């Protein structure tokens, strides 16, 4: 079995570190979510910061076939990154409470900013430690 080649410094730590050491270069991000063109913000220091990764894009394009969110209740987006899944769920179902959770402070900042830019009031952004123990969850992505 071959050993995995290490990533360059700082590349994979965004998955596990609240405050990664990689430079946080933020930039505008134009993206289409839930049929709306949105002007958001992203960073080089989060997963798939330059746009939708292929798997997320496929999921969002096929929600009606694989994972339609509930129309109300609470959906948790675990590992929200810059927010594409949380924002899509919130846009599709304004009556849904969306709780976006990420270990990365940068990802949480981006998701909160992007929810604000999209005019969404039904997105709550939390660190894993902030999630209430008694949170009733109807769906998790």
Region locations from a protein language model:
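Conserved SAM/SAH cofactor-binding pocket of Class I
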Residues: 58-133, 137-141
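N-terminal auxiliary segments of SAM/dcSAM-dependent transferases
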Residues: 2-36, 44-49
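Conserved SAM-binding loop and adjacent beta-strand
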Residues: 44-64
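Glycine-centered flexibility sites
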Residues: 35, 45, 55, 79-83
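Generic secondary-structure boundary/loop-capping signal
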Residues: 43-44, 49, 82, 128
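Generic detector of intrinsically disordered, low-complexity, polar/charged segments
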Residues: 1, 7, 32, 70, ...
């Amino acid at each position: 079995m071959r050993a995995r080649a290490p990533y360059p410094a700082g590349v994979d730590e965004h998955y596990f570190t609240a405050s990664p050491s990689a430079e946080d270069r933020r930039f505008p991000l134009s993206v289409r979510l839930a049929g709306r063109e949105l002007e958001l913000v992203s960073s080089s220091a989060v997963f798939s910061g330059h746009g939708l990764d292929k798997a997320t894009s496929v999921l969002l394009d096929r929600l009606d076939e694989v994972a339609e969110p509930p129309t109300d209740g609470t959906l948790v987006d675990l590992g929200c990154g810059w927010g594409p899944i949380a924002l899509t769920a919130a846009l599709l179902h304004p009556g849904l409470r969306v709780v976006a959770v990420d270990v990365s402070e940068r990802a949480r900042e981006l998701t909160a900013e992007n929810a604000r830019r999209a005019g969404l009031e039904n997105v709550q952004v939390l660190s894993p430690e902030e999630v209430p123990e008694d949170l009733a969850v109807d769906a998790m992505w």
